[in-house]
């Protein structure tokens, strides 16, 4: 049985979340609280497996409460967020502080998505209850430069995640990388993981990066802006018609897909709603397939932490066209779903701990 504490100043939300969660016989809401101070008391009392935490509350807000939880009694925390720019910025800060994911607060609205939201909530609670959390993503070693060999990333299956990385054997590199486009698919637990990876890449990174992160439309712009402020490379929300540039990461806008298309003299970004019936928007499958079809062996596909199997079908195409693939290790995922699908399908060329992912990507451009 998975125990949950719900912390929210809205009586409606406390009731709604509790009702949704307890529809699953494996989940029990052991207590609720109306603000952060009361929340800390009931968390200490009940020691729950998972906490859902509102951001805006009287007396003690969600971010302050989260800091106390992470310092005193770390456990998986799901933030309850409004789908606004302000809500997005606060939620991204919460993810940086240690929250594992977020759920939308607009549960009071009549919506055709309510069943999906309920299912996602229960699935997230069940998945994150099994996993350890990623801490605030700060670089753990100096970023490699494009002209100097990076350390070889450690394969998770060969050694524990806590083992030190071994220096790479000097690699004989071509004057230009073999691969010049990196496609990244990621979901639950993704923002801290993406920040950890991108913040370790050098400003002269010789490839373009395209990222499909499962995230609402109001969140992707602030997410890109936050990353751009802490990374040596440029990070932006993708716009149709842009020419792909090395040393730039393009974040797919929430609610839309990200593709690339060959033009006469360059590769171009395409933002689209097609296919409309895709389970996720943005979709890692759509991104991987497009990059595979357009770039062939010039593509490097990376699947990071996330629920489900989005990215697997697209990765099949990328691999068939000569691309290379990397999956995040089980030991370092918040949720080992999307990477597991790649590994189980035999599509992963490397399985890498998140701390070593930037180095693996650097080296992967030359393989």
From Swiss-Prot:
The modification 4-aspartylphosphate is found at residue 54. Keywords: Chemotaxis, Cytoplasm, Hydrolase, Phosphoprotein. SMART domains: REC (SM00448). One of its GO terms (molecular function) is protein-glutamine glutaminase activity. It catalyses: [protein]-L-glutamate 5-O-methyl ester + H2O = L-glutamyl-[protein] + methanol + H(+); L-glutaminyl-[protein] + H2O = L-glutamyl-[protein] + NH4(+). Phosphorylated by CheA. Phosphorylation of the N-terminal regulatory domain activates the methylesterase activity. SUPFAM superfamilies: CheY-like (SSF52172), Methylesterase CheB, C-terminal domain (SSF52738). Residues 3-120 form the Response regulatory domain. Residues 175-367 form the CheB-type methylesterase domain. Contains a C-terminal catalytic domain, and an N-terminal region which modulates catalytic activity. Belongs to the CheB family. Involved in chemotaxis. Part of a chemotaxis signal transduction system that modulates chemotaxis in response to various stimuli. Catalyzes the demethylation of specific methylglutamate residues introduced into the chemoreceptors (methyl-accepting chemotaxis proteins or MCP) by CheR. Also mediates the irreversible deamidation of specific glutamine residues to glutamic acid. This is Protein-glutamate methylesterase/protein-glutamine glutaminase 2. It comes from Nitratidesulfovibrio vulgaris (strain ATCC 29579 / DSM 644 / CCUG 34227 / NCIMB 8303 / VKM B-1760 / Hildenborough) (Desulfovibrio vulgaris). The lineage of its organism: Bacteria, Pseudomonadati, Thermodesulfobacteriota, Desulfovibrionia, Desulfovibrionales.
């Amino acid at each position: 049985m998975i125990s949950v504490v719900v912390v929210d100043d809205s009586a409606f939300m406390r009731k709604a979340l509790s009702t949704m969660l307890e529809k699953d016989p494996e989940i029990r809401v052991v207590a609720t609280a109306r603000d952060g101070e009361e929340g800390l008391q009931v968390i200490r009392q009940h020691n729950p497996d998972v906490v859902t935490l509102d951001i805006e509350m009287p007396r003690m807000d969600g971010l302050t409460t989260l800091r106390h939880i992470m310092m005193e009694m770390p456990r998986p925390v799901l933030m309850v967020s409004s789908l606004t720019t302000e809500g997005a910025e606060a939620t991204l800060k919460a993810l940086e502080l240690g929250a594992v994911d977020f759920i939308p607060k607009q549960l009071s609205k009549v919506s055709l998505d309510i069943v999906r939201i309920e299912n996602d909530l229960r699935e997230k609670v069940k998945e994150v209850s099994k996993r350890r959390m990623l801490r605030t993503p700060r670089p753990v070693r100096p970023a490699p430069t494009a002209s100097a060999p990076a350390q070889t990333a450690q394969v998770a299956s060969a050694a524990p995640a806590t083992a030190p990385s071994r220096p790479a054997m000097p690699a004989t590199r071509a004057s230009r990388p073999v691969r010049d486009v990196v496609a990244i698919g990621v979901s639950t637990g993704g923002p801290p993981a993406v920040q950890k990876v991108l913040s370790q890449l050098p400003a002269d990174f010789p490839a373009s990066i395209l990222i499909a992160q499962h995230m609402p439309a109001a969140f992707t712009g602030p997410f890109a802006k936050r990353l751009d402020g802490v990374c040596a490379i440029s990070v932006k929300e993708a716009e149709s018609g842009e020419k792909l540039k090395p040393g730039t990461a393009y974040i797919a806008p929430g609610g839309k897909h990200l593709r690339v298309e060959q033009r006469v003299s360059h590769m171009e970004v395409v933002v689209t709603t097609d296919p409309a019936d895709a389970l996720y928007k943005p979709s890692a499958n759509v991104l991987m397939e497009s990059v595979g079809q357009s770039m062939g062996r010039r593509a490097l596909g990376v699947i990071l932490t996330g629920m489900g199997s989005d990215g697997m079908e697209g990765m099949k195409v990328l691999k068939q066209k000569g691309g290379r693939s990397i999956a995040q290790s089980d030991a370092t995922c918040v949720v080992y779903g999307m990477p597991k699908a790649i590994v189980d399908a035999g599509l992963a060329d490397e399985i890498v701990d998140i701390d070593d992912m930037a180095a693996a990507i650097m080296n992967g451009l030359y393989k």
